[in-house]
UniProtKB/Swiss-Prot annotation:
Residue ranges, annotated region (3-dehydroquinate synthase): 1-380
Function text: The AROM polypeptide catalyzes 5 consecutive enzymatic reactions in prechorismate polyaromatic amino acid biosynthesis.
HAMAP family for the chain: EPSP_synth, Pentafunct_AroM, Shikimate_kinase
Native organism taxonomy: Eukaryota, Fungi, Dikarya, Ascomycota, Saccharomycotina
Protein name (Swiss-Prot/TrEMBL): Pentafunctional AROM polypeptide
């Protein structure tokens, strides 16, 4: 019989815990809870599991045996937090009523917290209360929601706001149910377990710390073996339940003690309310616990060690401790931007445990103990501080700052890391006290544990670290050792790694890696020395920096080791500490000059002596040390001295404020160089310093009386130079400056600290300049300090702890609050620094949150886009790699590196000759070596074009896959194979293929696929225009895959054309016409005649060749009304992944697919938007059925960008029901409509991305009722959705304007109820009064001369372009502001779009110059357009120079405008590639102007800068070919663009501003040109 543990709650043993106790559950319920009806309610996921089936079967058989007259009912609801709502509760109640359930009913809630909460609430209210049994199946439910009788549902305003206390008859925690739990849900539950131990039971917390590694290994396995941790798991659940049961028994209705269970929940619930359902409850509570623990530390109640210990424990269980953790951000995506302080505080203010609107928090006093056993009221100011990473430091208040203070800084980082290395290499047990608990030491401890270097535990509530060393017997591990930005740990472990033995169960290497900054910091000299001594170490990325791959089992040879030690003393300490374990005694000789930071080398030697190894300094050689072989013997106790570098901050505070501060445990006998700071720096600056062997006291002079130091050599204490710099900033004595030298190594720390100090001191109005090995600071009076601008982001810390702490001191001397970024970076050495500033020094501190406009979607792109990371291009020879790589490099501003050229340089001959002499096998070997080296050498700012056969070699393939795995882009380019064959057959410059080209492709096809994460298929180009279009579509593709431009979901009425063709080749020429009026175009992959990857890629190429619209990539399965087989999940997943590789803007993802498949696609989506879709093919679901809400919620929970739901209308009413549903479904953009003839109204009413058809598109089975854009607009107008509007062209003359032709043709094509007419006037006031004020149907104006400036005063707001250009050509009503008007300028768009449509590529990263000819109003728009296109310099040429001088004066300096006012100026000008002619075409051209222009045309035509034919755009559209166009094209072979194109392109933009619809390009173009 399986053992069952019973826990008493409210006086009865009703909580039963065990493993596999289904028999016990059934027996207890049927025997002790007599009923005519038992109802088991679960969710659809749980209903399919083995443990549930077992419970159900046992219940059915036992009921027949014990109570044959009773019945058993089952009901399943949809899973997920979003279904814990009123609708689902009502559906369960309706079921119970329909089944005739009465007051004696017993309900069993079998499921996670959602089921337990909601079904408990059903039981509380059904028939005014029936009995309920909780059978929790998730860890979270077992230890939290099922115990204590709290029941509830969620509302749109928050979680659990409607509910009741309703105690269950039993709670059965059967731990075997956890076998069904996904890993993330398992980990999620541990947050509540850790919380319970943290508030109540330190002994249990210690056990949990030890259990974490085993737990995580088991639950993360593909098939978790819970039996292997059965006893510990049961104990984990049991102990957590015991605490909660005790607390609930003492305070059932949560009036006092029970509030303690809400530790982490005040902040956690607020975060969850914003991030649900993407973030889980336990994840949010985990973050909440750390934030509330930091609050307790900030208030001076909780020790920094306890916070560190709690954080480490949560991380050990795989839980997040910060919203900005990489893995957590992946889950919540863009929702991260919704986590704003004001929103969180509002959520906290309506928390159920508050006293009115006063926010209450549980304050932790120690691990296992809460402060005063109750929740406390906390201020919003203190909460704001802990919730933000940016901080406002208020001016120091003389009345509040204590005159004397005693501060004990955390343990020394330098000594802490050395002690951990020595203890791990030593034998015996050592108790380390005052260890620094920071990011650096955390990484070191984790690394030592991973390498089995020592067993590590804690005592004294975490204050003492107990290390039992294994005598240097470390072994390799599978996982990479991630060291964050911990420079000390990385350098020490680099020497430890070769000593590591090989673990037969894992690999033969140790990999050391870190964050982005760590991967820039130098480690080369240390690696060189170790390699020379027999170690095998490879750089995995950038030469000279982490990550490193170190061969285990090699050891150190010993003997003489030479090391360059002028950059970092840590290199020296690293080898010193590991030297006793070399094969021979070591002589370490430091070469290259005087070693840096000699005192830190002395510190290492002194510590080695304490651990039993004596180092002797050579008497014959300078900077040389002899280290004997041996083994460290750990002392019984080792006390870490406080960090002397950190001590400089409180001492400097005293110096700056004229107060006194004592550091009681650092004095003249310190091992640390920085202990001399007070004596060598602060005393000569005017401070009174008293230093004993063990303490230091500084008393500052009165404020403003510090003296500059003409020169101080800080080489013995380089880290303290930042503190000295901020003190020197307010040390003024005439013109005397302070010069600090000996600190060159500070340029390669967490950032370039010298440059950082210069740039940030400047924000305070303090001038500083760099010296070859230091900094010079020109101090000013504190009264003259400037407050750095908060709007300009205040003080940048460069994620450097010492920069942040230093400037927190200077900030308080300003007259106003100073913003300091990234305050959490101080966690590296002093996590509680801000708490000290607040509690000890009584400094007022506020949290600060960046205004939302700074954190828009582009900020996310910058964070997660490709950035400067190099892009690797692979593909068949002849696939266009060279051309497209060149285009890509030009667009991105990258360097193009052809690996064939790199290879030829290395082998000293051309590839063809090498292959003839050495053979293909040797060539592939050399190619793989060059590839691996190049991927590291050219890791940033390059496009690497590879040879076609790079995928032939396994080693090269592994290098490519590794690059993809590390987050890089490997782009596979391909084109039609027949075209490739034709091209290659004619190419004699490259070595001949051994096989036929098609055979080669078939062999390589899968290799290309598995080695790349992106794929672009080039359509065949048969004309110059098609070639230009290919370049533009390829650039758009690159923008998408690099995150440079992310598709924006339309916010207004919009459409997409759904293509149901089997092959787009047949309709390519009609695609632009077919997609008229659409905002996107859908490729139905399942309807294609074949779904091979090549054919699907070819179809996307046809789309890109034919239209610029975003692509929606859809594969509909048979059960969802499509043609793709239902059961081919593997093939389906590959095709979905192909869509992402092809860089489509939208991917349709069916909600009925397996959950793991959905999650894999969502994880890999990159910058593609996901449309989560569900189609009710049967037509049986009405829109008030809860299943629709469940499907919508499922899409929201998955984190899709849009949700698409398709029903079938069996009656007209179904359309109205859908609109009710739409009105309540607002969490994510929704596309929802009904198919069928009776469903047409729903398509008309759908506001966003409605699918449309076209006369040329074949009808699709099951899609009856499809309409085209014009039909929808007509119907929408008829029912009042669109109303009549009037638009005008205003100015004088307007009689010949083509604008009415353009706009009216568009209205007619799209069936819009609008009219565009002419209104001739020279009076802007008349136009405003008669057209805008008096016409109730006013839609908008197109403004021409002479009103473009005069009309501006009648607008309420101007666009950026209108402001800069100083003219308006479009007026519309401001959205949502009736009677207020926006002035816009689309002339510049007409100019830039004319160039772009003609094939001019993006010029942002290309050194291209432009010229504007003329000085009128259009010239201003032309200047703006050329700047937007990316021209680096804009020249201007005009007959009347004063006019263009005026334009030059009015434009910002960054436009870089130069005037060509003489032939000499023209001769001196750089080549020009783009010209806009804005002079009248109907008058003779001035001869002098023409002479200058022709010189420009000649030079530009010869130079051909930018990789395209130089182009001239004519602004005049009459005559069709102007004299300037003729000269440019015929005489100088420039490409010319007629003015009618500019008219059309500005009109198209104007059309969209006026109507919100995409103009039908061909139709309006024809109306302007041919009518």
């Amino acid at each position: 019989m399986t053992s069952v543990e019973k826990v008493s709650i409210l006086g009865a043993e009703t909580i039963h815990v065990g493993y596999g106790i289904q028999d016990h559950i059934v027996q207890e319920v049927i025997s002790h809870l007599a009923s005519s009806t038992y109802v088991i309610v679960t969710d659809t996921n749980m209903a399919r599991t083995t443990p549930f089936t077992k419970l159900r079967n046992k219940f059915e058989s036992k009921l027949k045996e014990l109570r044959p007259e009773s019945r058993l009912l089952f009901y399943s609801v949809s899973p997920g937090e979003n279904n814990k709502n009123r609708e689902t509760k009502a559906a369960v109640e309706d079921f119970l009523l329909q089944q005739g359930c009465t007051r004696d009913t017993v309900i069993l809630a079998v499921g996670g917290g959602v089921i337990g909460d909601m079904i408990g609430f059903v039981a509380a209210t059904f028939m005014r209360g029936v009995r309920v049994v909780q059978v929790p199946t998730s860890l979270l439910a077992m230890v939290d929601s099922s115990v204590g009788g709290k029941t509830a549902i969620d509302t749109p305003l928050g979680k659990n706001f409607v509910g009741a206390f309703h105690q269950p008859e039993y709670v059965f925690a059967d731990v075997s149910f956890l076998e069904t739990l996904p890993t993330r849900q398992f980990i999620n539950g541990m947050a509540e377990v850790v919380k319970t131990a943290a508030i109540w039971n330190e002994e249990e917390f210690t056990r949990l710390e030890k259990f974490s590694k085993k737990f995580l290994a088991v639950v993360s396995a593909k098939t978790p073996d819970l039996i292997s941790i059965k006893e510990e798991l049961v104990k984990t659940v049991l102990e957590s339940i015991r605490v909660k049961a005790f607390v609930v028994s003492s305070d059932e209705k949560e009036t006092g003690l029970r509030n303690l269970l809400n530790f982490g929940h005040t902040i956690g619930h607020a975060i969850e309310a914003v991030l649900t359902p993407q973030a889980l409850h336990g994840e949010c509570v985990s973050i909440g616990m750390i934030k509330e623990a930091e609050l307790a530390r900030y208030l001076g109640v909780l020790s920094p060690v306890a916070v560190a210990r709690l954080s480490k424990c949560l991380v050990a269980y795989g839980l997040p401790v910060s919203i900005d953790e990489k893995d957590f951000l992946k889950k919540v995506g863009n929702k991260r931007h919704n986590v704003e302080i004001d929103i969180l505080l509002k959520k906290m203010a309506i928390d159920k445990k508050n006293d009115g609107s006063k926010i209450r928090c549980v304050i932790l006093e120690a691990i296992g103990k809460c402060y005063q056993l109750k929740a406390h009221q906390v201020s919003k100011q203190d909460l704001s501080f802990v919730l933000t990473d940016e901080v406002l430091v208020h001016p120091f208040d003389d009345k509040l700052i204590p005159k004397t203070n005693v501060v004990i800084p955390p343990g020394s980082k330098s000594i802490s890391n050395r002690a951990l290395v020595l203890a791990a290499l030593g034998t015996g047990t050592v108790r380390i006290k005052n260890l620094l608990h920071s990011d650096d030491t955390k990484h070191m401890l984790e690394a030592v544990a991973s390498l089995k270097g020592a067993s590590i535990s804690t005592e004294d509530n975490g204050e003492t670290i107990v290390v039992t060393g294994n005598g240097g017997k470390l072994v390799s591990c599978d996982e990479q050792l991630y060291l964050g930005n911990a420079g000390t740990a990385s350098r020490f472990l680099t020497s430890v790694a070769p000593l590591v033995g090989i673990n037969p169960q894992s690999g033969e290497h140790v990999v050391l890696t870190g964050n982005a900054r760590m991967q820039e910091r130098p480690i080369g000299p240390l690696v060189d020395a170790l390699r020379a001594n027999g170690s095998e170490i490879d750089y995995l990325n950038k030469e000279g920096s982490l990550p490193l791959k170190v061969k285990a089992g090699k050891g150190l040879n010993g003997g003489r080791i030479e090391l360059a030690a002028t950059i970092s003393s840590q290199y020296v300490s690293s080898i010193l500490m590991c030297a006793p374990y070399a094969n021979e005694p070591v002589t370490l000789s430091l070469v290259g000059g005087k070693p840096i930071s000699q005192l830190y080398i002395n510190m290492t030697i002194a510590m080695m002596k304490t651990f039993g190894i004596v180092v002797t300094k050579s008497e014959t050689e300078e900077h040389t040390y002899h280290i004997p072989r041996g083994s460290y013997v750990n002392p019984k106790e080792y006390v870490i001295e406080s960090d002397a570098s950190s001590a400089t901050y409180p001492l400097a505070f005293a110096a700056l404020t004229g107060t006194s501060c004592t550091i009681p445990n650092i004095g003249s006998s310190s091992l640390q160089g920085d202990a001399r700071f007070a004596v060598d720096v602060l005393r000569p600056m005017g401070c009174e310093v008293v230093q004993t062997a063990t303490s230091t006291t500084v008393t500052g002079p009165s404020v403003g009386n510090l003296k500059p130091l003409p020169h101080v050599d800080m080489e013995p204490m380089t880290d303290a130079f930042l503190t000295a710099s901020v003190v020197a900033a307010v040390a003024k004595n005439g013109t005397q400056s302070t010069s600090i030298t000996g600190i060159a190594n500070q340029r390669v720390k967490e950032c370039n600290r010298i440059a950082a100090m210069v740039s940030e001191l400047a924000k305070f109005g303090v001038v500083a300049n760099e010296l070859p090995d230091g900094i010079e600071i020109h101090g000013i009076s504190p009264n003259d300090l400037v407050t750095p601008s908060t709007e300009k982001r205040g003080i940048k810390t460069f994620d450097d702890h010492r920069v942040a702490m230093s400037f927190s001191l200077l900030a308080g001397l300003c007259k106003d609050k100073v913003l300091i970024q990234e305050r959490s970076c101080t966690g590296k050495t002093w996590p509680g620094w801000w708490d000290i500033l607040h509690t000890k020094f009584k400094v007022a501190i506020d949290g600060y949150e960046l205004p939302l406009q700074h954190e828009d979607s582009t900020a996310l792109v910058e964070k997660h886009g490709n950035g400067k990371r190099s892009i690797i291009v692979i593909g068949m020879r002849g696939a266009g790699k060279s051309t497209l790589s060149k285009w890509m490099a030009s667009f991105l501003g990258f360097k193009l590196v052809d690996l064939d050229d790199v290879l030829e340089e290395k082998i000293g001959t051309d590839i063809r000759s090498f292959v003839q002499q050495q053979g293909w096998e040797e060539f592939r070997k050399q190619e793989a070596i060059v590839a691996k080296e190049s991927f590291i050498k050219f890791s940033e700012g390059c496009v690497l074009s590879t040879g076609g056969g790079i995928v032939e070699g396994e080693e090269a393939r592994e290098s490519l896959k590794s690059y993809v795995k590390s987050g890089g882009i490997v782009l596979h380019l391909h084109r039609d194979l027949d075209e490739t064959v034709v091209l290659l057959s004619a190419d004699t410059t490259r070595p001949a293929y051994v096989d036929e080209i098609k055979q080669v492709w078939l062999r390589r096809e899968n290799w290309y696929r598995e080695c790349s994460n992106y794929h672009f298929y080039s359509a065949h180009c048969s004309s110059d225009a098609e070639f230009k279009h290919l370049r533009n579509s390829f650039t758009t593709y690159i923008k998408t895959i690099t995150g440079f431009h992310v598709a924006q979901i339309p916010k207004k009425r919009s459409f997409y054309t759904s293509l149901t063709f089997s092959d787009l080749t047949e309709v390519a020429s009609s695609l632009e016409d077919i997609s008229t009026g659409s905002d996107a175009i859908e490729l139905r992959v399942d309807l294609l005649k074949e779904t091979t990857h090549t054919f699907v890629a070819d179809q996307t190429a046809i789309l890109r060749k034919s239209t610029n619209l975003p692509i929606i990539y859809t594969i509909r399965t048979e059960s969802q009304g499509g043609k793709f087989p239902d059961n081919k999940f593997e093939e389906l997943e590959e095709l979905l992944a192909l869509g992402i590789k092809l860089g489509v803007q939208y991917l349709d993802l069916q909600l009925d697919l397996p959950n793991d498949l959905l999650e894999r696609i969502l994880e890999s989506k990159k910058f593609t938007k996901i449309i989560a879709s569900y189609v009710d093919v049967s037509g049986s679901l009405r829109w008030d059925n809860v299943e629709w809400k469940n499907r919508y919620n499922q899409g929201v929970s998955l984190g899709a960008d849009l949700v698409k739901l398709v029903g079938r209308a069996n009656s007209f009413q179904d359309n109205l029901s859908l609109e009710v549903f739409r009105g309540t479904s607002t969490l994510k953009p929704l596309i929802a409509y009904n198919v069928g003839e009776k469903g047409k109204l729903s398509r008309v009413l759908n506001p966003r991305l409605t699918p449309v058809t076209h006369a040329k598109i074949p009808a699709e089975s099951g899609n009856e009722g499809a309409l085209d854009v014009a039909q929808i607009n007509k119907a929408y107008t008829d029912i009042g959705g669109l109303s009549e509007k009037h638009f005008w062209i205003v100015g004088n003359p307007v009689g010949h304007s083509r604008s009415p032709n353009l706009h009216n043709a568009g209205y007619k094509k799209l069936n819009l109820p609008y009219v565009f007419d002419r209104f001739e006037t020279s009076d802007a006031g008349e136009a405003f009064q008669k057209l805008i004020k008096e016409d109730k149907n006013f839609g908008g104006l197109a403004v021409t001369m002479p009103l473009k400036v005069d009309i501006m005063k009648y607008t309420d707001k101007l666009s950026d372009s209108a402001q800069v250009i100083g003219a308006v050509n479009t007026v519309i009503e401001l959205e949502g502001e009736q009677g207020k008007y926006l002035g816009e300028n689309t002339d510049w768009v007409g100019i830039s779009e004319s160039f772009v449509r003609d094939g001019i590529p993006n010029l942002e990263n290309v050194n291209v110059n432009g010229l504007v000819v003329g000085g009128g109003g259009t010239s201003r728009a032309a200047v703006y357009a050329l700047h937007q296109l990316g021209c680096k310099k804009i020249y201007m040429l005009n007959r009347t120079v004063s006019k263009i001088q005026e334009i030059q004066k009015n434009f910002p300096a960054e436009y870089n405008i130069e005037i060509l006012d003489s032939v000499e100026a023209v001769e001196a000008a750089q080549p020009i590639s783009l010209i806009v002619s804005c002079i009248p075409a109907d008058k003779p051209i001035d001869e002098q102007l023409l002479n200058k222009l022709e010189r420009v045309l000649y030079v530009g035509g010869e130079a051909k800068i930018g990789g395209f034919t130089p182009s001239l755009l004519e602004a005049s559209y009459k005559p069709r070919v102007t004299p300037i166009m003729k000269i440019a094209s015929e005489k100088y072979e420039w490409n010319v663009i007629p003015g009618v194109e500019m008219l059309v392109n500005q009109g198209i933009t104007q059309f969209q501003l006026h109507t919100g619809f995409v103009a039908p390009y061909d139709v309006v173009h024809d109306a302007v040109v041919n009518q």
